[in-house]
Amino acid sequence: MALVVKGKVNINEFIDLSKSEKLLPSMFTPVKSVMVSKVDKIMVHKNESLSEVNLLKGVKLIEGGYVWLVGLVVSGEWNLPDNCRGGVSVCMVDKRMERADEATLGSYYTAAAKKRFQFKVVPNYGITTKDAKKNIWQVLVNIKNVKMSAGYCPLSLEFVSVCIVYKNNIKLGLREKVTSVKDGGPMELSEEVVDEFMENVPMSVRLAKFRTKPSKRGPKNNNNLGKGRSGGRPKPKSFDEVEKEFDNLIEDEAETSVADSDSY
């Protein structure tokens, strides 16, 4: 069965265009060219994967110009029988950013029992046409507790974006026109579904772990480290220890930012 975005992508959900901006020629308005991309599709075969996704598929870019990624609609469908256990985390990533917490644009968690799902992310930032041609966006997928034999596809994802292309730096004021944007870092979108699935590792931590390659060097000989002196250098913490501390911090202090989501 083909996976489709529910209805037509509504630009007004992401950009609040005035009547004059809809009617006047582009030279008289700050908004030059609003476009909706073609659908890009990913078939998920592995429990954990980091795949490139073309969020500007079919968008006509301006040479030497810019593109502003305003909004993104992600649709998913489980290719499973009804009432299966488990779930998935889907995280949008800007691969240019080296710090994992800054690379994550938004994440979404849902159970496999919910056969179809759809959510929206509002990245609200611009890049150069040159960078856009390098296909800088990725999707990190983590499927948990779904028991399917290797080689099959438990989940399909599709992506459609709303963007603005322009030749020169866009006029001040457009940011204020983009709706549903909140301060406070990456958005975390969450479904209120109770199943045998629970996301317990922040997606930025999971991305950092996924990006890290095992060291080819052997362990250092630290037998004499700190002996005979009280001011020895402390032993570096393992990833699991840092991850545990991060989880405790999230539970104690962090507050999940809920953005618009739509399921069908």
UniProtKB/Swiss-Prot annotation:
Belongs to the tobamovirus movement protein family. Residues 210-219 have a biased composition (Basic residues). It is found in: Host cytoplasm, Host cytoskeleton; Host cell junction, Host plasmodesma. One of its GO terms (molecular function) is RNA binding. One of its GO terms (cellular component) is host cytoskeleton. One of its GO terms (biological process) is transport of virus in host, cell to cell. Keywords: Host cell junction, Host cytoplasm, Host cytoskeleton, RNA-binding, Transport, Viral movement protein. Binds to host RBCS at the plasmodesmata; this interaction seems required for viral systemic movement. In resistant plants, interacts with host MBP2C at host microtubules; this interaction prevents virus cell to cell movement. In resistant plants, interacts with host resistance (R) protein (e.g. tomato ToMV resistance protein TM-2(2), AC Q71BG9) at the host plasma membrane; this interaction triggers host defense responses leading to programmed cell death. Residues 210-264 are annotated as: Disordered. InterPro entries: TMV_movement, Viral_movement. This is Movement protein. The lineage of its organism: Viruses, Riboviria, Orthornavirae, Kitrinoviricota, Alsuviricetes. Transports viral genome to neighboring plant cells directly through plasmosdesmata, without any budding. The movement protein allows efficient cell to cell propagation, by bypassing the host cell wall barrier. Forms a ribonucleoprotein complex with viral RNA. Binds microtubules and modulates microtubule stability. Can bind double-stranded DNA. Triggers host hypersensitive defense reaction in incompatible plants harboring resistance (R) proteins. Residues 237-247 have a biased composition (Basic and acidic residues). The gene is MP.
